């Protein structure tokens, strides 16, 4: 199964959050500029949005977080997060520890999340990755479902 890319935007007039197919071969600046001409501004996934997205997919789609990348390179931090993610596979309660750590990093250390990778174990399952710039890629057969879910969470967090 192949993955399909999407990009999240916000309508400037209605403030609604919407998704559009995205071709990673396209010039990113051109895509954002073209959307702007059509009345949209890009949505950025702040750490608070990313945390809400992770939580939604953990709870609603029986998912596991396979990787979290940060905007800064910190090997010690990466190792600590990797260990928590490993523990989460066997014990979902570690989500609270991870959530607290991610919130703290963002709020007090200005360390933001760059990318999150998730694997859903529900139904046929799917792979999903979400980036700070509002781009996501997901297994093709669940693109609309997951894209709608992402928009709903973004809408809720930024409201």
Regions found by a protein language model. Name each.
Residues 1-159:
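Intrinsically disordered, low-complexity, charge-rich terminal extensions
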């Amino acid at each position: 199964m192949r993955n399909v890319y999407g990009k999240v935007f916000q309508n400037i007039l209605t403030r609604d959050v919407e998704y559009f197919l995205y071709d990673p071969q396209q010039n990113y600046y051109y895509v954002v500029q073209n959307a702007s001409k059509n009345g949209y501004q890009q949505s950025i996934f702040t750490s608070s949005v990313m945390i809400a997205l992770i939580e939604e997919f953990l709870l609603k789609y029986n998912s596991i977080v396979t990787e979290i990348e940060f905007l800064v390179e910190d090997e010690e931090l990466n190792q600590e997060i990797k260990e928590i993610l490993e523990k989460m596979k066997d014990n979902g309660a570690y989500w609270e520890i991870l959530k607290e750590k991610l919130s703290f990093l963002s709020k007090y250390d200005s360390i933001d999340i760059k990318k999150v990778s998730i694997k859903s174990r529900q139904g046929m399952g799917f792979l999903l990755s979400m980036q700070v710039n509002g781009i996501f890629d997901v297994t093709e057969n669940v693109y609309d479902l997951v894209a709608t879910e992402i928009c709903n969470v973004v809408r809720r967090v930024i409201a």
